[in-house]
């Protein structure tokens, strides 16, 4: 069968309408898995042109990072918006990268199974969370297919929310044990106590105990 040299009008239309910037739509998520904190779900093919992708990213300012996949859908790298545009503004970048594919400018990054336990991952990236800046990671399924992106910032925000929830719970429990105000009224006396702990949670307490009927 001879090789087809030209696309039909229908094929050209399909090629023009096919989005460069694509998005994975996550299904039901287990709250204990790392998928819970994924914040970016966009990806592109590794053979897309660099400047075509740059135009799409300018139109979608909320995309901070995206996965790069081959035509089988397997993850091969990542594009981080900040680093990508820092490269694009270099002298002669337009001439150098005009017709080059995205795979020539993508970055390598750590990959995690989308079903991995969230807290296990937090332990693995603990060193990265201590460093300045934001580090991005790719989520994949068992076949290596793209399933999203999360970052050290996403993890820190989630852990911060847990901390705030724990503090709120501790404050509620403490208020039940040590009331903010209490009083005892006897025939010849009144005893009033008040306690307000630092930031709503603390170790200070008071105790009222009657030893004898008239004391």
What does each model-found stretch correspond to?
Residues 1-14, 60:
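Terminal presequence/propeptide segments associated with secretion/organelle targeting
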Residues 9-40, 80-134, 151-181:
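Tandem CBS (Bateman) regulatory domains
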Residues 43-63, 69-70, 112-134, 140:
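The conserved cystathionine-beta-synthase
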Residues 71-72, 142-143, 212:
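Residue-level recognition of short loop/turn positions
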Residues 75-78, 145-146:
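Glycine-rich acetyl-CoA-binding "A-motif" of GNAT/NAT acetyltransferases
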Residues 135-141, 147-151:
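Amphipathic alpha-helical protein-interaction segments
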Residues 162-215:
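… and, occasionally, acidic/histidine-rich disordered N-termini of signaling adaptors
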């Amino acid at each position: 069968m001879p090789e087809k040299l030209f696309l039909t009008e229908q094929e050209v239309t399909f090629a023009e309408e096919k989005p460069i910037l694509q998005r994975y739509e996550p299904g039901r998520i287990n709250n204990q898995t790392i998928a819970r904190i994924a914040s970016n779900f966009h990806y592109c093919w590794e053979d897309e042109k660099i400047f075509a992708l740059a135009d799409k990213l300018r139109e979608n300012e909320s995309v901070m990072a995206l996965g790069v996949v081959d035509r089988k859908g397997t993850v091969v790298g990542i594009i981080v918006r900040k680093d990508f545009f820092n490269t694009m503004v270099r002298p002669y970048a337009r001439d150098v990268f005009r017709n080059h594919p995205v795979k020539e400018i993508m970055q390598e990054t750590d990959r995690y199974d989308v079903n991995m336990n969230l807290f296990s991952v937090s332990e693995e990236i603990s060193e990265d969370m201590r460093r300045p800046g934001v580090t991005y990671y790719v989520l994949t399924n068992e076949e290596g297919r793209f399933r999203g992106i999360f970052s050290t910032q996403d993890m820190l925000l989630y852990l911060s929310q847990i901390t705030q929830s724990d503090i709120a719970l501790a404050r509620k429990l403490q208020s039940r044990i040590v009331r903010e105000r209490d009083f005892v009224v006897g025939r010849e006396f009144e005893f009033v106590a008040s306690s307000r702990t630092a930031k709503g949670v603390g170790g200070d307490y008071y105790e009222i105990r009657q030893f004898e009927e008239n004391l």
